[in-house]
Swiss-Prot record:
Cofactor(s) required, per the database record: Zn(2+)
Top-level enzyme category: transferase
Gene symbol of the encoding locus: rpo12
InterPro entries per UniProt: RNAP_P/RPABC4, RPABC4/Spt4, Rpo12
Designated name of the protein: DNA-directed RNA polymerase subunit Rpo12
Organism: Saccharolobus shibatae (strain ATCC 51178 / DSM 5389 / JCM 8931 / NBRC 15437 / B12) (Sulfolobus shibatae)
Length: 48
């Protein structure tokens, strides 16, 4: 399940909510530019 964020109102929504409107638009404000939110990962770097 992918999570997306709107470029205008910054609300997050899932891909099921994205399928409600035709095309790729924010289901809250209708803005066309959306970003896919990455899962927070921790990168461990070994100290020298």
């Amino acid at each position: 399940m992918a999570v997306y964020r709107c470029g205008k109102c910054w609300k997050t929504f899932t891909d099921e909510q994205l399928k409600v409107l035709p095309g790729v638009r924010c289901p809250y404000c209708g803005y066309k530019i959306i970003f896919m939110v990455r899962k927070p990962t921790i990168k461990i770097v070994k100290a020298i």
